[in-house]
């Protein structure tokens, strides 16, 4: 797939189907302005595409695991959202926007297609003694109300930096979030 996330995922899922294996795809919402942001409709189509195993059975659909650490305010998993029809688990590290850098505990959620996986995640957290502490829950509860403002401020600062780079180095290849996409939410 070279540097094209969508075609790379398509190739990987086709290979996994040919092996009759269980596909887990982990992706991060990119924050580096030099990293490609995939077309979400094309990503959804590739993740939703039905594939066949070598014996003609329908291949197991992928579980898409999305790291939303840098955009925890964007809804991808609701019934009307872009990934509603793809088995998806989303997580965000609490060390960034959710806690304002005051703790490392984060959170994960699943859409309706992946909710059956959540008890396994809860069991894993329990067995590994990796659940947030009471203090981390308190920090998150105190910090979450101001999270959206921190995200807005970070976007404004980064947008100013990207604009500066584009003006100073017009030949630089930057893939920062477009104004149109920002206006969509």
Q: Where does each model-flagged region fall?
A:
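Conserved PLP-enzyme active-site core in the AAT-like
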Residues: 1-166
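Conserved PLP-binding catalytic core of the aspartate aminotransferase-like
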Residues: 174-185
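Short acidic amphipathic segments
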Residues: 165-176
